[in-house]
């Protein structure tokens, strides 16, 4: 499983990119609004940092508007992936872009049927939302497993991006159950790298070394 960062904050992207683990970036209108910056200028800056898929979401709700927005975004770089909602209009736009070999990420997926529809419309990626399913008492991890199994059985190339990741267990389980990517907030990346035994072990090594120098 590969790692994406879920943010529109350029400094967070730059920081995690320096670790050498980032395959790409996902953004959405909420994340962009939080930063209070021009969307296109932000994307250009992200493209300069990360050489990988950058999911940029449209805000139109009709296929025509999604296509118009998506074409402008796709013109920025071959690394731009058009992020579309899991709706009938979103599927129409997905089909349009698939025919033109422009990659798409169908988002707000909450069922295996939705994922299968998106894949058959030509989606490059589907993004099932784990945390939001947990919030309503449903099993987001089982959804990842179901989608992975269905795609495998039917030879579907669409890749799974585990989204709405809230904590490290989501990451471990998504990897274990067949997700191709997890898109993770910077805060959770920092939780992934931390472990108290790592910290205490490092402190002991340094203390032992210091005692040798006396």
Swiss-Prot record:
Keywords: Cytoplasm, Pentose shunt, Schiff base, Transferase
Main location: cytoplasm
InterPro entries referenced in this protein's UniProt entry, alphabetically: Aldolase_TIM (IPR013785), TAL/FSA (IPR001585), Transaldolase_3B (IPR022999), Transaldolase_3B/F6P_aldolase (IPR004731), Transaldolase_AS (IPR018225), TSA/FSA_arc/bac (IPR033919)
GO CC aspect terms: cytoplasm
Catalytic activity: D-sedoheptulose 7-phosphate + D-glyceraldehyde 3-phosphate = D-erythrose 4-phosphate + beta-D-fructose 6-phosphate
Enzyme class: transferase
Associated pathway: Carbohydrate degradation; pentose phosphate pathway; D-glyceraldehyde 3-phosphate and beta-D-fructose 6-phosphate from D-ribose 5-phosphate and D-xylulose 5-phosphate (non-oxidative stage): step 2/3
Superkingdom as given in the UniProt entry: Bacteria
Function: Transaldolase is important for the balance of metabolites in the pentose-phosphate pathway.
Protein name: Probable transaldolase
Species: Brevibacillus brevis (strain 47 / JCM 6285 / NBRC 100599)
């Amino acid at each position: 499983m590969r790692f994406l960062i879920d943010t529109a904050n350029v400094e967070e992207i730059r920081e995690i990119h320096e670790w050498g683990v980032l395959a790409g970036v996902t953004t959405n209108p909420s994340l962009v609004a939080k930063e209070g910056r021009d969307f296109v200028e932000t994307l250009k800056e992200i493209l300069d940092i990360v050489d990988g898929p950058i999911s940029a979401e449209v805000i139109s709700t009709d296929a025509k508007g999604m296509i118009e927005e998506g074409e402008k975004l796709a013109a920025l770089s071959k690394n731009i992936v058009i992020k579309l909602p899991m709706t009938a209009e979103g599927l129409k736009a997905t089909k349009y872009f698939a025919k033109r070999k422009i990659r798409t990420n169908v988002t707000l997926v909450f069922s295996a049927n939705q994922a299968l529809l998106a894949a058959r419309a030509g989606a490059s990626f589907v993004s099932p939302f784990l945390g939001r399913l947990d919030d309503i008492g449903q099993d987001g991890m089982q959804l990842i497993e179901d989608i992975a199994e269905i795609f495998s059985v039917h030879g579907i190339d669409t890749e799974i991006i585990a989204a709405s990741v809230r904590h490290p267990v989501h990451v471990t389980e998504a990897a274990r159950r067949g997700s191709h990517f997890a898109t993770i907030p910077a805060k959770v990346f920092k939780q992934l790298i931390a472990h108290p035994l790592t910290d205490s072990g490092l402190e002991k090594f340094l203390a032992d070394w210091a005692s040798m120098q006396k």
